[in-house]
């Protein structure tokens, strides 16, 4: 009798994979962590998305983050993501979802040219993308004021957002910030924790778009979205 295929031996429906994975993470998380039940749920989903239990010890949740985030999502506040990968990872949402890296391009296609963002001179490839994200954050300032910022890739996006906050130009209801990398990511997230704004973040160089999406998806589930 031929041996069962690898797919037959190991593959499971997506829902069953998620159920088993979350149960395994729940069993592995410390029982006396100090998290509320809601915060524990979002930490659990972030660990699942990362496939790394060590992430649990790096997650930082502002005391007002869950309450403020749930209120904003239930009110259908705008969600602003830094890159498309974060937006693509989100559950269905009845409010608006904007992507900063696309914001300038959308503004230039506006029906009234006088409302469009001015064109910028060409820059080197890496710098051009970083600048475009920062300009997109600035262009989406009205959406960010009272909205939910979800930054999973670009430290530049978080730094630009913090500059807006410091200048008194916007006050997000919640910032989910997990930019990843060895340059500016840890510093940007540390700057975030120094400000009195509701946030969910991951200390150090770890992070990424899947973690940011997982954190917000946990809140969307809790909000009944």
Predicted regions and their residues:
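Long, charge-patterned amphipathic alpha-helical coiled-coil/hairpin "stalk" segments used as oligomerization
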Residues: 124-188
């Amino acid at each position: 009798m031929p041996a069962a295929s690898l797919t037959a031996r190991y593959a499971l429906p997506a829902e069953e994979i998620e159920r088993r994975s979350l149960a395994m993470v729940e069993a592995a998380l410390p029982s006396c962590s100090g998290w509320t039940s809601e915060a524990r749920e979002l930490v659990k989903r972030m660990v699942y998305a990362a496939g790394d239990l060590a992430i649990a010890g790096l997650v930082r949740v502002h005391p007002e983050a869950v309450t403020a985030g749930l209120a904003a999502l239930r009110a259908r506040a705008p969600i602003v993501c830094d890159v498309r990968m974060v937006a693509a990872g989100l559950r269905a949402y009845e409010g608006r979802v904007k992507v900063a890296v696309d914001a300038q391009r959308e503004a230039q296609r506006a029906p009234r040219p006088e409302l469009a963002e001015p064109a910028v001179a060409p820059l080197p490839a890496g710098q051009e993308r970083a600048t475009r994200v920062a300009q997109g954050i600035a262009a989406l300032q009205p959406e960010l004021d009272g909205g939910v910022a979800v930054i999973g890739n670009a430290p530049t996006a978080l730094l630009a957002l913090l500059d807006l906050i410091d200048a008194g130009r916007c006050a997000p209801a919640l910032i989910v910030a997990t930019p990843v990398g060895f340059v500016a990511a840890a510093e940007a997230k540390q700057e975030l924790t120094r400000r009195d704004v509701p946030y969910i973040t991951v200390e150090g160089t770890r992070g990424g778009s899947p973690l940011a999406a997982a954190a917000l998806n946990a809140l969307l589930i809790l909000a009944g979205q």
